[in-house]
């Protein structure tokens, strides 16, 4: 058992209006199956649980950076770990995500530009099978079906809008999963204030399951959440699950001297190893400049 000094179990937080109670620290797993092999991933999971952490987050798309060869790998690794530790499952809150439209990943639902009700139901069943569990505690939409300026984007471009499954139909599909006992609570990720408001108001209007959470990036080098999403979540009773709280490692200080690439850069670090990650929000020169200044204050 974890010692009381290291345990987080006495600080449980309720997720939105759901029944889920989680530790303030959630173990993100998106590197499992890419940078982290299965035996190492299992040791990390053991380490977290031994210290009282009860909250795990994954996704059908993982590992990252996304590749055809590692699609679904993270859920499978977690499922294998759970199978070897059957008594652990009841202690945990396991969150996973259904991928949104393909964004160039043609190995996800054949590159479809939409996610239908059938896709929601089939994706959930597939995640349950990979995770080797009979229920997903928190099922999230990884990114919106409609066009939004996500993953480092800033400005909304209405000319990029395309017809997709309406938010009401998405809610109805998720509600079916809850009523079927396959999902306990639902959430969103990489969402906007508009999207959160629509999901909440339509759920209330039609008597459907209300979203409990929004998982968006939030840290000292990415504060876009403060541009209205924080107020929206507060007033609508939706919890925030901030991801990348250390800015993909920028706020650890490991890039301060060397920069992201070149001599002295940490060879196995994500922003050094994967160009795709540098091209998005975390590899921008201004992000590293800001991180260095924050790290100097720490």
Regions found by a protein language model. Give the residues of each.
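N-terminal small/glycine-rich loop or linker at the start of catalytic domains
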Residues: 16-35, 95-111, 140, 144-154
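Short, acidic/polar
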Residues: 36-48, 116-130, 196-200
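Structural preference for beta-strand elements that scaffold enzyme active sites
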Residues: 22-26, 54-55, 91-95, 135-140, ...
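Phosphate/pyrophosphate-binding loops at sites that engage ATP/ADP/AMP, CoA/4′-phosphopantetheine
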Residues: 86, 125-134, 204
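Alpha-helix N-cap and loop-to-helix initiation/capping positions
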Residues: 36, 40, 69-73, 77, ...
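Beta/alpha (TIM)-barrel catalytic core signal, keyed to glycine-rich beta->alpha loops juxtaposed to Asp/Glu
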Residues: 9, 144-298
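A general structural detector for well-ordered alpha-helical segments in enzyme core domains, enriched
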Residues: 44, 74-81, 123, 127, ...
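N-terminal binding-site loop/beta-alpha segment at the start of enzyme catalytic domains
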Residues: 1-97, 134, 179, 265
């Amino acid at each position: 058992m974890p010692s009381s000094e290291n345990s987080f179990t006495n600080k449980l937080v309720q997720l939105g209006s759901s029944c889920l109670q989680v530790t303030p620290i959630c173990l993100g797993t998106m590197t499992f199956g890419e940078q982290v092999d299965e035996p190492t991933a299992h040791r990390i999971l053991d380490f977290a649980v031994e210290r009282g952490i009860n909250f795990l987050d994954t996704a059908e798309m993982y590992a990252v950076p996304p590749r055809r060869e590692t699609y679904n790998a993270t859920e499978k690794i977690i499922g294998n770990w759970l199978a070897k530790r059957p008594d652990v499952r009841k202690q945990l809150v396991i969150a996973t995500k259904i991928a949104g439209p393909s964004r160039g990943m043609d190995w996800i639902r054949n590159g479809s530009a939409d996610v239908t009700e059938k896709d929601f139901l089939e994706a959930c069943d597939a995640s349950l099978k990979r995770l080797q569990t009979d229920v997903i505690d928190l099922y999230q939409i990884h990114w919106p079906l409609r066009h939004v300026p996500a993953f480092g984007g800033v400005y909304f471009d209405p000319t990029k809008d395309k017809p997709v499954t309406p938010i009401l139909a998405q809610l109805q599909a998720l509600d079916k999963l809850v009523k079927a006992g396959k999902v306990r609570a639902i959430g969103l990720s990489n969402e906007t204030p508009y999207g959160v408001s629509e999901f909440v108001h339509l759920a209330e209007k039609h008597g459907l399951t209300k979203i409990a959470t929004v998982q968006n990036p939030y840290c000292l080098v990415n504060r876009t959440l403060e541009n209205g999403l924080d107020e929206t979540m507060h007033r609508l009773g939706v919890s925030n699950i901030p991801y990348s709280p250390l800015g993909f490692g920028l706020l650890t200080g490991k890039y301060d001297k060397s920069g992201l690439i070149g001599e002295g850069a940490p060879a196995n670090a994500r922003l050094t190893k994967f160009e795709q990650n540098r091209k998005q929000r975390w590899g921008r020169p201004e992000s590293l400049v800001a991180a260095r200044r924050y790290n100097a204050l720490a």
